[in-house]
A protein has these predicted regions:
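A generic structural signal for short, non-catalytic loop/turn and secondary-structure boundary residues
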Residues: 4-8, 46-50, 153, 166, ...
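Aromatic-lined glycan-binding groove of carbohydrate-active enzymes
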Residues: 2, 30-70, 94
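Substrate-binding cleft/loops of secretory-pathway carbohydrate-active enzymes
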Residues: 1-34, 41-48, 109-112
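Short flexible/disordered coil segments
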Residues: 16-20, 50-64, 162-170, 214
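Carbohydrate-interacting/catalytic domains
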Residues: 33-36, 65-66, 75-100, 104-214
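Short secondary-structure boundary/capping segments
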Residues: 2-12, 71-72, 116-119, 200-203
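Short, charge-rich amphipathic segments
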Residues: 6-28, 57-77, 123-137
Length: 214
């Protein structure tokens, strides 16, 4: 909005509700149906640079019968955690600042209840503890790699490598910093592994896996 001195409200960022609604809808689907809704995963990049956006997973999304972020994920116990990790990898590498409500980072099962504290005892269980460790590693990676946050207002900081692989529910892209240094991202939203998956790269060279949700 405009600065307060000329009558504006002085806000610097806008919540990206379109990204939030589309992404939560997509990730809540059974993986079988995701290929038919692939646009929900990619459409946000049509307007990602039109505003200074925040990607919001706020308290409003984990109360009033909406379910916790972990419980929004379909599948069995292990598939829910895998889905949450993939969701977080996509969120942290998508252009826009991040807002994640407390409890989502370790996979709280129940909705937020302002009458009581979070279910910290869940960290005694391996899946919750490993989820917390993954989110911590993801945060450290994000902080250490300007490609993920330095250029968020134009296409210099983002390029699709393949946005159209709906049959396998995979998207690939890269983020770039002001010096052109890149971080490549592959998100697999299918319920299965893809062996020997081939993806394009922006230039020839040797690439290494820096972080994996598995």
């Amino acid at each position: 909005t405009r600065p307060p001195e000329i009558g504006g409200l002085g806000f610097n960022f806008k919540w990206n509700m379109g990204w939030m609604n589309d992404t939560l809808f997509y990730t809540s689907l059974d993986p079988y149906f995701r290929s038919y809704n692939h646009d929900k995963l990619t459409f946000s990049m049509m307007y990602a640079f039109s505003e200074n956006f925040v990607l919001p997973i706020s308290h409003d999304e984990v109360v009033h019968g909406k379910g916790s972020l972990l419980n929004k994920m379909p599948g069995d116990y292990n598939q829910k955690f895998a889905g949450l990790r993939t969701f977080m990898g996509y969120m942290m590498t998508h252009p826009g600042k991040k807002l994640l409500f407390m409890g989502c980072e370790f996979g709280q099962f129940i909705e937020w209840d302002y009458h009581k504290q979070l279910d910290w005892m869940l960290l005694d269980y391996e899946s919750h503890r490993k989820t917390k460790d993954y989110i911590r590693a993801l945060n450290h990676y994000y902080l250490a790699h300007p490609a993920l946050w330095q250029v968020e207002d134009n296409w210099d900081g983002f390029r699709w490598l393949n946005a159209d692989d709906n049959t396998r529910s995979v998207i690939t892209y890269y983020r770039a910093d002001e010096k052109g240094k890149k971080s490549l991202v592959l998100c697999n939203f299918a319920a299965s592994r893809w062996e020997d998956y081939r993806m394009g790269v922006p230039e020839a060279g040797t690439y290494r896996v820096a972080l994996c949700s598995e």
